[in-house]
C-alpha cells in the first residue's frame, strides 16, 4: 500500500497491485510439456533427414553377366546400343523420383539408351500385382521393355536390391555403371548418377562408376 498527497493536501492510499498487476506465472508442468514437445519435433525432423539420406543395399553386378535361367536378364549380342536396366518396386513412392530422373537422362542423351525395367512382384502373386501408375509410366518410355521379376530374382542377380537401382551396359555387354540416379530418397534434381551415365554415353570419363541407391528394398 502506498500513501501519496493530493493537490488539496489530503493523503490518499494507492494499491500498488491495482497500478502494477501481478504477472501470472506459467505452471512448471506446462514449461516441461513445451520443452518435451519441442524436443520431439526436432527429433522427428532429424530422423526424416537421416531416413532420406540412408541408402539401400546394393552390390556390383557380375562382370560376366547374370547366370542364364528363365528369370535372368539377357542382352542381344547384336545390340549396338547402350542399355540401362532398372529395378523397380511398383509400390515404392521413392521410385517416382528415379523414373523422373531417368526421363531427364534420356532427354540429355537423345534417347541413345535402351531401357529394361525389372518390375518386382512377390512370389505369391501374379504379374497383375505390378499394375499401377509407376508401371504405366514405364510402358510409355521409348525403346523400353518391362519384365515381371518374381521376388526380385533377376534384379538381385545384377546386384540390385533396392528399387531405383540401375546397371548400365555398354554395346559389348560390359557393365559400366551401377547405382542410383537420385541424390536422396524421393529427391529430384542434379545428381552424380545421371551426370556419370550421361558422360559415359558421350565418351567421357565419369566422376563415378557407382553411386548409392535411395529407395525401398526389394
Positions of the model-derived regions?
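N-terminal targeting signals for export/organelle localization
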Residues: 1-70
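Short active-site neighborhood of thiol/selenol oxidoreductases, capturing the structured segment around
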Residues: 77-102, 112, 116, 197
Amino acid at each position: 500500500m502506498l500513501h501519496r498527497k493530493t493537490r488539496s493536501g489530503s493523503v490518499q492510499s494507492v494499491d500498488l497491485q491495482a497500478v502494477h498487476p501481478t504477472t501470472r506465472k506459467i505452471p512448471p508442468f506446462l514449461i516441461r510439456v513445451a520443452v518435451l514437445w519441442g524436443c520431439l519435433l526436432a527429433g522427428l525432423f532429424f530422423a526424416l533427414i537421416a531416413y532420406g539420406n540412408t541408402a539401400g543395399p546394393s552390390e556390383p553386378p557380375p562382370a560376366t553377366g547374370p547366370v542364364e535361367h528363365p528369370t535372368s536378364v539377357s542382352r542381344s549380342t547384336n545390340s549396338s546400343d547402350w542399355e540401362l536396366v532398372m529395378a523397380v518396386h511398383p509400390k515404392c513412392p521413392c521410385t517416382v523420383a528415379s523414373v523422373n530422373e531417368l526421363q531427364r537422362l534420356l532427354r540429355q542423351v537423345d534417347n541413345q539408351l535402351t531401357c529394361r525395367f525389372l518390375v518386382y512382384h512377390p512370389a505369391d502373386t501374379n504379374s497383375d500385382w505390378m499394375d499401377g501408375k509407376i508401371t504405366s509410366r514405364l510402358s510409355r518410355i521409348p525403346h523400353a521393355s518391362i519384365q515381371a521379376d518374381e521376388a526380385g530374382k533377376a534384379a538381385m542377380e545384377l546386384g540390385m536390391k533396392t528399387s531405383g537401382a540401375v546397371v548400365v551396359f555398354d554395346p559389348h555387354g560390359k557393365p559400366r555403371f551401377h547405382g542410383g540416379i537420385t541424390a536422396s530418397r524421393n529427391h529430384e534434381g542434379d545428381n552424380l548418377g545421371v551426370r556419370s551415365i550421361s558422360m559415359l554415353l558421350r565418351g567421357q570419363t565419369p566422376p563415378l562408376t557407382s553411386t548409392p541407391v535411395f529407395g525401398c528394398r526389394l
